[in-house]
Amino acid sequence: LEIGKNDKIKSLDLFKIDIINKNEKDNKLEFKKVNNNYYLTGSQFDGSKNIKNILVNSSKSIFSNFKNLNTYIYLDIDKYFVDKKSYLSNVKGEIQLKNSKIFNSNLSAKLNKNRNFELKIVTNNNQKITKLDIEKPAPFIKNFKFIKGFKDGNLNYESFEYEGKIKSNLKIVDFKVQEVPVLAKLLTLASLQGIADLLTGEGIRFTDFEMDYESLGNTTTINEMYAIGPAISILMSGYIEKNKLVSLRGTLVPATTINRTIS
């Protein structure tokens, strides 16, 4: 291990972890340098904190502790926890780093033994393209505090990052949410109490959800967001400033309104 200025790691040949963390999870990993590449292998690791940082667009990354790391990292981890109970198994793939930042990546795993998980990152002409596919993504969705009781569904995420600006598209199909506090409050104010009760009780099922949005700095602009379901459909747009302001506008259409219009 060689440490340079600003406490950045200049060189690392071997690093082993064999501990029990505060979540009472065993962490057994080996990070080993072979020629100019690294192999990250292990039987189990608690990565719940890393997952949360990724989902909230945190700039923190374990690779930022290295100084100008240019290498390939090959992964083979038996069990990678994404929260206290859920985990990715048989995590395999590779990550290419340039200047300590992810340049390309191709990872696959099984979520809770039998659900598909795939992550691909490709960089071309200074544009980074990220694609994420998750079957039954509830363990990841639960990190967003404004959604509770998410069930079922398939998630497809794609983003394009260029010069600090990120354009993203998120799709989720055939899912149920038990509680969305902000939406439930809006429905109550609109005298749609029956739907509000569903949203805080058994939940409302949606067949399709899609959101196109752009992120720059601390501001996320939602160009269009819609959700379609048998009880209610939603169309919204607006913007969100991190830890500050939320401004959304749109239309809520209950199924009773649609039925009356058709009849």
Tell what function each PLM region has:
Residues 1-220, 225, 229-263:
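Membrane-proximal interfacial segments on either side of biological membranes
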